[in-house]
């Protein structure tokens, strides 16, 4: 069996059912554009660490197979290597290989999250501007719940339990070509502030017959990621916050939750991280900073500051 044949089997048997749709699509891109052109026709039994090493070095220096392409960055190389290693690990479990030649190589750990965490004043400016532009419900939810962009636009109205103030997020639902696609049933549930629930109720009242949480008014279909980025860019331009990316809303939610006293394991569940170790790695600088503050200042002051941080999002909701 060639590597190409096994990768196709691995994608359909394992990856499609274990990964989010966007992750599956990203994996498919890496296989198609980087791994298969060089290694696809090699039998698994003949794949050695020398062959894998030459492949990785070639990709690092010369990039993909298009003429004139430049070398690949460290993050892309790490992703290629990790994906190949993951696939070959499964080949061993399937009894098709005795060892994994990709494990002969190591890449440095990825850098910690480089986040722009909004200050309380910036959050007020951002949300005030979102309200003026008519975008408040979507972006208030993004900021207070830490949702990914793809999760946000794929929400359905019945994901919200108004009575319990909970939102169930489907981790295997996505918007593709302006249609909702379901790939599985994996979910996580988070609790929302009552003010956010009230905003969502008002948003749904605009289109009470739509199953969508957020429906584009002109097309009556889900928003595309490009549309959400356009709306976000409109907000930050008018608010004078050009340095704030959409993903910084999620980071801000995470950091404020830590300052609130939320445990890392609980935050990992809220953000949809598969392992708490990912959360600890991403937000280690903030965890260390908080630990140092607790050690360096009187306990009373620490509790007072934590209480102030705990009230930030609540105060923002009381316009």
Regions inferred by a protein language model and the residue ranges of each:
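Basic, Lys/Arg- and aromatic-enriched nucleic-acid-binding interface segment
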Residues: 70-74, 78-80, 93, 97-155, ...
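Proline-centered turn/helix-capping motifs that create local helix->coil transitions or kinks
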Residues: 92-101, 161-165, 201-210
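Catalytic-site neighborhood detector that most strongly recognizes the C-terminal catalytic loop/helix
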Residues: 173, 271-297
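C-terminal catalytic core of tyrosine-transesterase DNA break-rejoin enzymes
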Residues: 93, 136, 140, 144-151, ...
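N-terminal core-binding DNA-recognition domain of tyrosine site-specific recombinases/integrases
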Residues: 3-4, 11-96, 112, 221-227, ...
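Short, polar N-cap/turn motifs at the start of nucleic acid-interacting alpha helices
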Residues: 159-166, 262-282, 314
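Active-site/catalytic core of tyrosine-dependent DNA strand-transfer enzymes
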Residues: 172, 193-241
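C-terminal secondary-structure termini that scaffold catalytic or DNA-interacting sites
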Residues: 164, 175-198, 202, 218, ...
